[in-house]
Amino acid sequence: GMDGRGDAPELNSRMLTRRALLVPQHGELSSEPFPVSLYRYRQTAMATGWEITLPGLAAMQMDLVDEAFSRLHDIESRLTVYRDESEVSSLNRLQSGVRVPITPDLVEVLGRCLNWWEMTGGAFDVACGRMIKEWGFFKGPASVPRPEAPGIQPEANGMDKVDLDLAERTFRWKAQGVELNFGCVGKGFAVDAMAGILTIPRVL
């Protein structure tokens, strides 16, 4: 998941500048009779190393590489629970019954998560932030919670407490004290978004 290490200054700082580090390498493509140059662009986000590898002239399109990494950091800033100023953190502080507008990213992620929650009969659930904290998976240490621990009770968790208006792009909590955690979907959502920027006919 998107653990707190991703926001530590020594881990989350971008390499050198906002422009990704260029690392030339050489490889062999089976369809080519000669070696081709591969270029790797690396940055860190969500406590993970991210890399874009492009061949030949495609690797020279630095504006699109920068755009892809900028999109990654933008998504992290919205979905991480390890920054008080993130969008999801603001939703987790929201009083129940108060409806607020949310960004297109949150609409899309929450819409997908609601569908998966319904498809799995509630087994897939991102409204389990309280439970994650009770188990010590937020900032540690990990430990089995007491059966009576407030954060593991049904009333403290569950997408059934989420009211998402897709048409109006708004959100409200139906119950107080429930929290979102996108640790299970954040990286995949970011990969899809970055691939959309780099896909044919633009680069790949």
Task: Give residue ranges: language-model regions.
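A contiguous, well-ordered beta/alpha segment that forms the leading edge of an enzyme domain
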Residues: 3-183, 193-203
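Short, conserved phosphate/pyrophosphate- and ester-handling motifs at nucleotide-, phospho-/glycolipid
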Residues: 187
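Residue-level recognition of oxygen-bearing side chains
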Residues: 190
